[in-house]
Amino acid sequence: IAAVYETRLPRQPLRFVLADDPEAGKTVMAGLLIREMTLRADARRVLIVSPGSLTEQWQDELREKFGLDFELFSREKQEQCHSRNYFAEQDRLIARLDQLSRNEEYQQLLAQTEWDLIVVDEAHKMSANYFGNKVNETGRFKLGKFLGGLTRHYLLMTATPHNGKEEDLQLFMSLLDG
């Protein structure tokens, strides 16, 4: 709790990696941060990006522990929305990492929006690495750079921030540069 209230919230903009052991409470820390930023009017529009297997868990935990209601993005909701851009219609949204990284249409729709805070869970999946002198940027890494440009506050959460190679860690940390 002190990490959220004493260390992170006073810094503006908030752009950092939250790296801790599995089951160490990263989701709770993110929830506290989201709730507090919402109460302070620093974050009205919040997007959470996570692996598909975790989206409903995020939705449930944010509702049950923090009283925050988030919608889940889906192809069906996008197809049925009146504005033709579900991302623009929702102020609190959870989307699947691979659904966004593999779909250029969704990225084009996202490009038309701005977010106060974007949280990425399992952010180590947005990796890039050096192969000789060349940088190999994955689609997920490109998504991470793209998301960083859509928001003022950017939180990357991971239990495994790097693979032991300093160059790859520097590439991962560059996602925060926005």
Residue ranges and their predicted role:
Residues 18-20, 122-123:
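Short acidic donor-binding/metal-coordinating loop in glycosyltransferase active sites
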Residues 1-8, 12, 26-31, 35-149:
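SF2 helicase/translocase NTPase motor core
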Residues 21, 51, 160:
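P-loop (Walker A) phosphate-binding loop of NTP-binding proteins
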Residues 18, 24-34, 157, 165-172:
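Extended, hydrophobic alpha-helical segments in both membrane/secreted and soluble proteins
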Residues 128-178:
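Post-DEXD/H (motif II) to motif III coupling segment of the RecA-like Helicase ATP-binding lobe
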Residues 15-19, 47, 155-156:
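Short hydrophobic/aromatic beta-strand immediately N-terminal to the Walker A/P-loop
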Residues 14, 46, 161-165:
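Short, surface-exposed helix-loop/turn micro-motifs enriched in polar/charged residues
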